[in-house]
């Protein structure tokens, strides 16, 4: 799996959670693993059925920490998403003046360079569920 400034994201069409995690762990150290879906009406946007504006993961957490006089110190070099349950919600990508949109289905994955490529979401999340892994890159 090769991410570069010219190709800051990779789409994987057919995989399973086990193989996905094994490949992602080769890229670095996980700093957080979570489930993204529509679980409520309050809190983080990643757990609500709502559009999400283009962003780099960690921006919201850093802003919320700063509001409380705290710091957010997790490194999120790579964002890895595995689709546990598909849906109609569109994942939007934006990098270096380019854009792409993908509707993830079960067994598909996205690996995104979180320093180059912003992402967002539009459309109804419904019961779509993603496994999200934040990765701090291995020293190169």
Protein language model annotation of sequence segments:
Residues 1-21, 33-140:
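Active-site environment of non-heme Fe oxygenases that use a 2-His-1-carboxylate facial triad
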């Amino acid at each position: 799996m090769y991410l570069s400034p010219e190709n800051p994201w990779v789409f994987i069409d057919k995989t399973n959670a086990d193989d996905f995690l094994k490949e992602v762990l080769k890229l670095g150290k996980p700093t957080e693993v979570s489930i993204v879906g529509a679980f409520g009406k309050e809190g983080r946007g990643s757990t609500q059925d709502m559009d999400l504006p283009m962003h780099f993961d960690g921006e919201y957490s850093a802003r919320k920490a700063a509001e409380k006089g705290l710091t957010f110190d997790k490194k999120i070099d790579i964002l890895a998403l595995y689709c546990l349950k598909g849906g109609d919600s569109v994942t939007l990508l934006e990098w270096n003046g380019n854009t792409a949109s993908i509707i993830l289905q079960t067994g598909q994955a996205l690996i995104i360079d979180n320093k180059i490529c912003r992402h967002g979401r539009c459309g109804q999340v419904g019961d779509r569920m993603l496994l999200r892994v934040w990765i701090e890159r291995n020293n190169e």
